[in-house]
Amino acid sequence: MTSRWIFGLVFLVCAGLLAVAFYMEHVMGLEPCPLCWLQRFGFMGAGLVSLLAFLHGPRGFGNRVYGLLLIVAAGAGLAVAGRQLWLQSLPADQVPACGPSVDYMLEVLPWFEVLQTALKGTGDCAEVVWRFLGLSIPGWTAVFFSLLIVLGLFVMLRRYSPRDWLQS
């Protein structure tokens, strides 16, 4: 499988995961917390990088650059998912207080303060509202971000032959 098709697959996975997030929000009625929003941005970043790589069809060094960008986007998302998993593991008396919604913060606070508040997480972020096979939503996003990092590493570290370049 060429790197171009790997990036295409990553884009489709990211688009599918974002569709699931919007389904959970608008159909199931789950309100996303600030860390959930940041994880969505991680998937958007990884998806955008992958779409650009798929459309560009890079060779050699270009694959490594796109692979690195994919790793950076997925790594940031994994860090945010890890933060939320940590908040969910805290005892009830150590959970931070609930904060305002993201929409409200965007209306009244500067962007930098919204980002700082979102990265800290709130009590909303510590609440487990849904599970599948024993994992909460940030658990599943951590699994998918880890998979994206592995695919980014694969694209970066694999050896490229002229035959691969012709199939891009």
Swiss-Prot record:
HAMAP family: DsbB. Residues 1-6, 59-65, 159-168 are cytoplasmic. PANTHER family: DISULFIDE BOND FORMATION PROTEIN B. It is a multi-pass membrane protein. Disulfide bonds join 33-36, 98-125. It is found in: Cell inner membrane. Residues 24-41, 83-139 are periplasmic. It comes from the Bacteria. The lineage of its organism: Bacteria, Pseudomonadati, Pseudomonadota, Gammaproteobacteria, Pseudomonadales. This is Disulfide bond formation protein B. Belongs to the DsbB family.
